[in-house]
C-alpha cells in the first residue's frame, strides 16, 4: 500500500513537471523555423511619430545620467521625442546633472515606491499628447537609430512592441547566466510566439505602447509586476504584442548572487500573483477563443527553469536509487529539458565559457528553491536591484 501511494505521488509530480517541459520544448522547436526573425522594411519617407520616453529611476545615481546622455544621441528629430526621468530617492547632485540636460526631471514623493507609481506619476504630470510612450530602465542603453527603427515598425500598425533586451555586461558568472537566461526568454516567449502568430511577452523595459492606450491603463496598475499587468490588459483586449528582434536595448545584468536572488524572488512573486489574477478570466478566454490569454495563463504556471532542472535532477537521482524503472521517465524529462534549452540559446552564446558556469547555476538554483517561502502573493513590495 505504501509503495502504491508513492507511485501515485510520483506520477502526479511527473505529470505536473511534464507541462513545463512540454511548453518549453514546443516553443524551442518553433524557434528553429527562423533564426533571423521577421525583418521589417526600412522606409525612410515614413512620417516621424512623437515619443515620450520614460526613465523610472529609483536610487539609480550610478547609471541614470549616462543612460540619458546616450539616449539623447538619437538620430531622430529632437522635436519629435521628449525624455522624462522619474527621479525617486536620488541624490541632489544627480538631479542637478539631469537638470542640465534637455529632459524633464520629475521628483515624486512616495510613501512606498514602485515602478508602477513612477509611471503613473509621469503620465499625470505630462500635459502634451504623444503618439507613443517608451519605457526604459535607468541602466538601459540603446543605439542611435533606436527611435528611427521603432518608428518604422510602428507604421505597420502595432500598438504594443517589446524590443530585444540583451546583456551589456558579462563581468561575472552570475551576469553571464543572467544574460543567457534573458536570451532563452527572448527565444521561447517572444520570438517563437510571434512566429506562430501569438503575442510576445513583455519584459519590463524596452517596451513601447500607443500613448492613448497606455495613459488610460497605467492608472490601473496595482502591483510590483507592472509589465505582467500591462500584458494581461493587452491580451484581454485582443491587442497583439510585437517582438522587435532587431531593435536592441542593452540591459545591465546582475553581477552578484544576492542581487540575482532578489530579482528572481520579485519575478516569482509577480508570476504567482499574475497566475492567480488571470484564472478568474480564463473561462471567458476559452469562450472567446482568446488563445493568447490561455497561452499566457499556462505560461504563468510554469516552474522557473532553474528550479525545474534542479527538481528533475533530484527526482531522477532519488528514483534511480529507490525504484530504477520509475526513474526512466524522470531522466527522459531532464534530457528533453536540457536539449530544449540548448536549442533556445542563440548560437553565439553556445560556448565552452558559458557551459562552464553549470556549477554557479546549480548553487543559484538551490538558493532560489529556498526563497520560495518568501514569495509575496500580493506582490505589493518593491524589491530594488542595486547596480554595482
Regions inferred by a protein language model and the residue ranges of each:
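Short beta-strand-to-loop acidic/aromatic patch adjacent to the donor-nucleotide binding site
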Residues: 129-141
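A conserved acidic beta->alpha catalytic loop
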Residues: 86-95, 110-112, 141
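Cell-envelope/extracellular polymer assembly enzymes that use nucleotide-activated donors
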Residues: 49-52, 82, 229
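Acidic helix N-cap motif at the loop->helix transition within catalytic regions
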Residues: 65, 91-99, 145
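Long helical/loop segments within the catalytic core of UDP-sugar-dependent glycosyltransferases
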Residues: 107-118, 122, 144, 149-223, ...
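Active-site nucleotide-sugar/metal-binding loop of Leloir-type enzymes
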Residues: 120-132
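Short, acidic, metal-binding catalytic loop of nucleotide-sugar glycosyltransferases
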Residues: 69-80
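Membrane-embedded multi-pass helical conduit in multi-pass membrane proteins
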Residues: 29-33, 37-45, 299-379
